[in-house]
Regions:
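Long, intrinsically disordered, low-complexity segments
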Residues: 2-5, 118-131, 160, 164, ...
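Flexible, polar/acidic helix-loop-strand segments at domain edges
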Residues: 6-130
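Structural register within alpha-helical repeat arrays
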Residues: 131, 138-145
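Alpha-helical solenoid repeat scaffolds, predominantly canonical TPR units
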Residues: 135, 152, 159-162
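Structural helix-adjacent loops and short alpha-helical linkers that scaffold large soluble proteins
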Residues: 146-155, 171
Length: 234
């Protein structure tokens, strides 16, 4: 237990206890296609991701330690969102298969298929090269080439925006190096492309030198009735 003033001294946005995923509403559609948010369902299973619990009297909080507190509604709440370790998916340091980022991987998974805790059960071949990458490769080649013609630049911009419009974007963006690199980062996430992109751009050392990766931890704040969620970068 620590004092809540140490971590929750900032005024945080709050989100409903039954819908913490509302924190990510209005984001790029590809985000929800790639990751599971706290409180979402995967098939018929609710995904519980929680790393902290603020005491109802505001005297302190629990973070990444199994504990329980009574809320102002008289119900018992737990640090990780549930009493049993098989019921939650985040931040428990005692086992190695809980998320520490606040999110779970979703891309490429088939929601309707039953989950099996075993190796080599998949039947889908690995997609090494897909059409979206072809479009992004072309856009990058044109923007990096100093002698690109106006027609090539227009075709490359069309290719770049075709990737975005498939993901429900309505607006067009300009063909710039920054935009091409950002779209590769978003569109090709979790496809084993990022390391090679950074190496090719000679920016790998800048991205990872003295870089501390942080997670977004959902805390259930019991100081209100009903209780609500806040997200803390830790």
């Amino acid at each position: 237990t620590r004092r809540s003033s140490d971590l929750l001294s900032t005024r945080y946005l709050s989100f409903p206890i039954d819908k913490p995923y509302q924190a990510f509403a209005g984001r790029d559609a590809r985000l929800s296609a790639m990751v599971l948010f706290p409180g979402q369902n995967f098939g018929s299973t609710k995904i519980i991701i929680q790393g902290g619990l603020v005491k109802a009297d505001g005297s302190g909080y629990h973070y990444r330690t199994q504990a329980s507190e009574k809320g102002q509604d008289g119900l018992i709440y737990y640090t990780y969102g549930a009493e049993k370790s098989t019921e939650y998916s985040g931040f428990d340091p005692t086992l190695g298969h809980y998320t520490r980022s606040g999110f779970l991987f979703k891309k490429f998974l088939q929601i309707e298929s039953p989950v099996e805790q075993a190796w080599s059960k998949g039947t889908q071949p690995w997609i090494d090269f897909r059409y979206g990458e072809i479009l992004l490769n072309y856009a990058e080649a044109v923007i990096e080439k100093t002698t690109s013609t106006s027609a090539e630049k227009q075709a490359a911009q069309d290719a770049l925006n075709a990737v975005r419009k498939r993901a429900a974007h309505k607006d067009d963006i300009a063909l710039t190096q920054a935009n091409v690199r950002k779209e590769r980062f978003v569109e090709l996430a979790f496809e084993n492309k990022r390391r090679w992109d950074l190496s090719r751009w000679r920016t790998f050392h800048k991205e990872f030198e003295n870089r501390v990766r942080k997670g977004l931890v959902p805390f259930l704040d019991l100081r209100t009735n009903p209780a609500h969620y806040v997200f803390v970068r830790v």
